[in-house]
Amino acid sequence: MQVKENKQLCLISLGCSKNLVDSEVMLGKLYNYTLTNDAKSADVILINTCGFIESAKQESIQTILNAAKDKKEGAILIASGCLSERYKDEIKELIPEVDIFTGVGDYDKIDILIAKKQNQFSEQVFLSEHYNARIITGSSVHAYVKISEGCNQKCSFCAIPSFKGKLQSRELDSILKEVENLALKGYKDMTFIAQDSSSFLYDKGQKDGLIQLIKAIDKQQALKSARILYLYPSSTTLELIGAIESSPIFQNYFDMPIQHISDSMLKKMRRNSSQAHHLKLLDAMKQVKESFIRSTIIVGHPEENEGEFEELSAFLDEFRFDRLNIFAFSAEENTHAYSLEKVPKKTINARIKALNKIALKHQNHSFKALLNKPIKALVEHKEGEYFYKARDLRWAPEVDGEILINDSELATPLQPGHYTIVPSVFKDNILLAKVLSPF
């Protein structure tokens, strides 16, 4: 029997869903603590940091400083994850308020580090396996599954390989065991994630690893629905798009950050791809029935000129992504682009403002296209007193949108799970829907 310690833990997980998986592994090691959202009452405050771009670093630092100010006497403050790893040589002096620093290699040893009250930075980047117990957060029906760590790409702007290392794929059997274990606990919807999902198993000499994963999950039949995030253009193929389209489990969801469309900019960004390849993949994705396409672009990369920006702008307006992340270039140490001549911030801000208008126009069109027709959805939990929170089954959690179902229109309370619903109203970036039936 698991016995709870009479101690409280406040976990703050910053950054991406990949970070969240590592946070859930740490929760698994600290199962005997009582969880609290109140840092002031916690005996242990654990902040899993993000160190991706400047804004993320500032958020991590501010969160640490706020926790240091709020923590009670005797409480332990821990900073783990990417920011700690990236700046491990200087961070102890820069933020002396922290009691324990650890990076990206020791998530499964967090209980030992707390007991010994010691710092640790293992060289090997940690990759969660099926035998690492996780406490899933935020949902009783959805879980993330990390299929690899690190990245072999050499993008000019990205510092991630400098602290997350080379591509390190899990064995397919380990992933299948984790999926089975989670499905037995009721998690029937999963999102598969990595730094570069489409390169899964490249490090083991296999070029169709993600296709094999899709086929294995289909054959296993443990899940009702799934999707894949973070496809990289140069390792994404028409065959992979076809495998997703043919799958009864994987949704027709395509998340492929293109970063730019101009050939000259793709070369400057060292993306190892071309406009022609992007267009071939994107057109194939659009041909898939009821496909949902998300992408990411960077505005103001060094040497981006007006002509290249106009080319990008015209393409985005013509293609009409369902969702689009727009980032301002962030100059990061240990990257090729760091020392290149910068585009003025004023120019970057003006370009982002113009692209945001385009992105919002097409996003709203994507939402409105769902009105007054049956769609498959996942109901996750009660949101406030009167509504259930749901999402289109194609959507990734948190980032793609929100659907609310009014409980006053229901004969009986809803259990989390899969339902056919009909959205009827789109207002304030939210869809309101009625439930037809479970499936």
Swiss-Prot record:
It comes from the Bacteria. GO terms for molecular function: 4 iron, 4 sulfur cluster binding; aspartic acid methylthiotransferase activity; metal ion binding; protein methylthiotransferase activity. It is found in: Cytoplasm. [4Fe-4S] cluster 2 binds at C151, C155, C158. Its main location: cytoplasm. Binds 2 [4Fe-4S] clusters. One cluster is coordinated with 3 cysteines and an exchangeable S-adenosyl-L-methionine. [4Fe-4S] cluster 1 binds at C16, C50, C82. Pfam families: Radical_SAM, UPF0004. Residues 7-119 form the MTTase N-terminal domain. Residues 137-368 form the Radical SAM core domain. Its cofactor is [4Fe-4S] cluster. Keywords: 4Fe-4S, Cytoplasm, Iron, Iron-sulfur, Metal-binding, S-adenosyl-L-methionine, Transferase. One of its GO terms (biological process) is tRNA modification. GO terms for cellular component: cytosol. It catalyses: L-aspartate(89)-[ribosomal protein uS12]-hydrogen + (sulfur carrier)-SH + AH2 + 2 S-adenosyl-L-methionine = 3-methylsulfanyl-L-aspartate(89)-[ribosomal protein uS12]-hydrogen + (sulfur carrier)-H + 5'-deoxyadenosine + L-methionine + A + S-adenosyl-L-homocysteine + 2 H(+). Catalyzes the methylthiolation of an aspartic acid residue of ribosomal protein uS12. Belongs to the methylthiotransferase family. RimO subfamily. This is Ribosomal protein uS12 methylthiotransferase RimO. The lineage of its organism: Bacteria, Pseudomonadati, Campylobacterota, Epsilonproteobacteria, Campylobacterales.
